[in-house]
Amino acid sequence: MIRAHRNAVIAELETRLPGAVFKSYSAAAKAPTVSRYAVVFIGRASKPRTRFTGGQWRDIYTVTVHSVGSDEDLALWVEERVALLTGVKLTVTGRNVWPVEYITGQPLNLDDDGTRPLWFTVSQFDIVSDPA
């Protein structure tokens, strides 16, 4: 189920960043001509009970998106498109997904560890998902 939610996020971001959304940095590295892109990571943040005596049906996923660019402006350009994920109601088969909530972010920073320095910023979102 976690991959279905990740894939829904990637599909939504692809509408704004065609060919520039990846599920890992290794996948992004296979597209070396891309000067700006987003990398999506997802993890289950919690599985709370919706009722005191009920089961743990609800899933809450935290999505972390790295917006990357070859310069500061390109990284921020990607981040502006990633931010539009806020409020979107994703479609995941068999689930009732609530609108995406923006949680937090990190400011623009430089990663100069590699052979080619890249600028990046980080955004985090929560996705609340109930069985349909």
Q: What residue spans do the PLM features occupy?
A:
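Aromatic-acidic/polar surface patches that form glycan- and anion
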Residues: 2, 74, 114
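Oligomerization/assembly interface segments of phage tail-like spikes and tubes
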Residues: 55-74, 118-129
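Generic structural motif
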Residues: 27, 43-47, 68-70, 128-132
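Acidic-leaning, charged glycine-interspersed low-complexity segments
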Residues: 85-132
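Short, solvent-exposed beta-strand/turn "edge" segments of beta-rich domains on protein surfaces
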Residues: 50-56, 112-116
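Small/polar-rich, solvent-exposed N-terminal microdomains that initiate assembly or binding
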Residues: 1-53, 88-96
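Mid-chain, well-packed structural core segment of small domains
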Residues: 70-87
